[in-house]
Amino acid sequence: MEHWTLSGILAFLLLLSLFLPSLLITFIPLTSKPPVSSWKVLSLPKTSSMVLNAPLKPLNCSPSLFLFAPETKILSVTLKQTSVNSYALKVSCKDL
């Protein structure tokens, strides 16, 4: 009968902790549906395409104001859902 040393047991547990998550991820079925939530989560590609397709308007905030006095201006960017597949991007610059 072979006896395990403490270093052997620790090495085995370390390897097991490294490989076990990847094995579990491999065998999780990909057909499961995500849980239903009241919050709508926007995926990154959808969000980035909405931002790229939004018409851009010049702001009254110059970059120099943000460089020299960032505490005097607030740049606000909001994304509002206007219909099922339509979003509006609102960008505003306000004084504190």
From Swiss-Prot:
Record-given protein name: Lysis protein
Organism: Escherichia phage G4 (Bacteriophage G4)
UniProt cross-references to InterPro entries, sorted A to Z: Micrvir_lysisE
Signal among keywords: no
Entry keyword set: Cytolysis, Host cell lysis by virus, Viral release from host cell
GO biological process: killing of cells of another organism
Domain of life: Viruses
GO molecular function ontology, one term from the record: enzyme inhibitor activity
Keyword Metal-binding in annotation: no
Record function comment: E protein is responsible for host cell lysis.
Pfam families linked: Microvir_lysis
